[in-house]
């Protein structure tokens, strides 16, 4: 749809004028809700009894594998290190991934829950920082939930405390708030930006904000997509940048990646979107927007036959030395078209397809790909999750009771592929060394819990397996873990894996945030240590 006028600097729309040629998206919203109920009903059959909640449960290195206070449970035969601490919250945690950043001598963790609470925690102790948690500032009588991952960014420069930015939106609960909110580290509100609404579809922002430099100056800009059909870019004060918002005429689920193409002034915005006739496309769009001579320009765009709900990753993946944009697809258009079973890669500079791509997947790839070295070749690979489907409809992806994680080299050759327990995986992989070598291994979740996988061989590590056991099977994952060298004093100090999990509210489990010691002190930095690579969530390989 289109609008009669752009919003003001507070993000308020004067009024809405729908186009007769544009269909509404009531069917899309209804189908999403039905799908999630079906997924939950399949997974509930495998659920164990719910554990009690607690504020913080620090665990000694030799503690028993189960902590009754917060439900930390190791699967059968698991040799993964015992948890350093575990914190349970009253709201469930679904697709919001933990984000980790350092400020001073403290490492902080930020994650959102389905009650609209944003948690900011000391990663060494597991305790909320002073002034936290904070509920998003939804108007009275509205329901607010968070599935966007919080972004931690130094909007006032590297010598001032960071800010935390997150969107309100949910596919699991009926969210009625439509905003992106920025907080100061103290918990004080920095700004609230209200997005619009589109007739017949859900409201809100599930897209994770990315922070970068769009215009080439020193300012840090905030970029995100919205279900109101628009792509936004804001200043640190929450005001729109020139040329924004950009009308996509359909919903945006994807989180943007920001990357400065060599020879350009500022970062390009690479983002996926839905398409149902916009630019003569029925399926999904992957686009590159950038400022050219001071004006915002659509530099290149590809139309694929399926929605693009995946969040793109950017990085060099072959000997060309050119950065590639790698992205998966969704599952709206049914019977599934060809693109549903593909992972795409385009060169960032001009949008040309990378030789050997797209590659074949076992179903939709909802998560964000990870890029990094996972073997001794010295060349980065691509790792992503996908559903396992045996037909051309979303229900055919439920009855397989499985998902898959796969690694490809930059030429599109499959290196290895592993099946994971539980269907319709929404988790994104993280790449970090779990051994003493110079390459990265894979940490990835599913509805069954967290898996550790050898990056070079694809074999399961620490006793995890798709048929028997995961790291804490009560910690259902619909997001990504974070890996960091945690500063400060406390049981979680040092190299750690931080997991936020439990699953949607349909499971009746509290949200759980757990810190585990990394099995080894890595001799190389993790290549892709959290969702969309870094605290600013620019989605670009280091």
Residue ranges, per PLM feature:
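N-terminal low-complexity Pro/Gly-rich stretches
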Residues: 1-23
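Generic alpha-helical structural signal
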Residues: 2-5, 26, 40, 478
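Secretory targeting and sorting signals
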Residues: 16, 22-23, 29-62
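Extracytoplasmic/lumenal domain signature
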Residues: 59, 63-542
């Amino acid at each position: 749809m289109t609008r009669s006028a752009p919003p003001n600097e507070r993000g308020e729309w004067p009024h809405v004028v729908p186009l007769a040629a544009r269909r509404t998206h009531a069917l899309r919203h209804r189908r999403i809700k039905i799908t999630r109920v079906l997924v939950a009903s399949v997974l509930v059959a495998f659920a164990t009894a719910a554990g009690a909640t607690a504020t913080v449960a620090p665990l000694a290195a030799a503690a028993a594998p189960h902590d009754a206070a917060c439900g930390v449970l190791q699967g059968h035969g698991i040799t993964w290190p015992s948890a350093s601490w575990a914190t349970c919250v009253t709201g469930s945690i679904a697709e919001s991934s933990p984000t980790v950043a350092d400020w001073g001598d403290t490492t902080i963790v930020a994650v959102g829950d389905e009650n609209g609470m944003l948690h900011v925690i000391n990663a060494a102790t597991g305790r909320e920082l002073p002034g936290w948690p904070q509920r998003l500032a939804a108007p009275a009588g509205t329901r607010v939930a968070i599935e966007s991952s919080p972004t931690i960014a130094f909007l006032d420069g590297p010598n001032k405390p960071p800010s935390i930015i997150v969107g309100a939106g949910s596919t699991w609960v009926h969210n009625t708030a439509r905003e992106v909110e920025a907080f100061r580290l103290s918990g004080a509100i920095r700004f609230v930006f209200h997005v619009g609404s589109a007739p017949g579809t859900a409201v809100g922002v599930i897209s994770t904000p990315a922070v970068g430099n769009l215009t080439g100056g020193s300012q840090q800009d905030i970029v995100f997509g919205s279900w109101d059909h628009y792509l936004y870019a804001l200043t640190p004060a929450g005001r729109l940048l020139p040329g924004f918002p950009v009308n996509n005429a359909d919903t945006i689920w994807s989180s943007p990646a920001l990357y400065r193409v060599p020879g350009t002034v500022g970062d390009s915005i690479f983002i996926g979107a839905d398409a149902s006739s916009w630019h003569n496309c029925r399926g999904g769009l992957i686009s590159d927007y950038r400022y050219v001579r001071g004006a915002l320009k659509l530099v290149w765009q590809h139309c694929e036959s399926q929605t693009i709900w995946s969040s793109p990753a950017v990085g060099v993946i072959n000997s060309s030395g050119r950065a590639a944009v790698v992205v998966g697809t969704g599952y709206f258009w049914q019977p599934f078209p060809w693109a549903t079973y593909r992972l795409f890669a385009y060169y960032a500079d001009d949008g040309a397809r990378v030789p050997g791509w797209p590659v074949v997947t076992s179903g939709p790839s909802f998560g964000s790909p990870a890029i990094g070295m996972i073997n001794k070749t010295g060349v980065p690979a691509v790792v992503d999750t996908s559903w396992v489907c045996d037909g051309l409809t979303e229900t055919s992806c439920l009855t397989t009771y499985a998902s898959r994680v796969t690694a490809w080299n930059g030429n599109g050759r499959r290196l290895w592929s592993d099946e994971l327990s539980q269907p319709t995986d929404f988790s994104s992989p993280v790449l970090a060394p779990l051994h003493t070598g110079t390459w990265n291994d894979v940490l990835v979740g599913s509805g069954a819990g967290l898996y550790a996988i050898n990056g070079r061989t694809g074999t399961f590590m620490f006793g995890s397996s798709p048929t028997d056991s995961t790291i804490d099977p009560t910690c259902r994952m619909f997001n990504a873990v974070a890996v960091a060298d945690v500063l400060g004093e406390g049981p979680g100090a040092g190299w750690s894996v931080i997991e936020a999990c439990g699953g949607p509210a349909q499971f009746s489990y509290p949200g759980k945030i757990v810190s585990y010691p990394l099995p080894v002190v890595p001799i190389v930095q993790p290549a892709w240590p959290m969702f969309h690579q870094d605290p600013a969530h620019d989605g670009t390989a280091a």
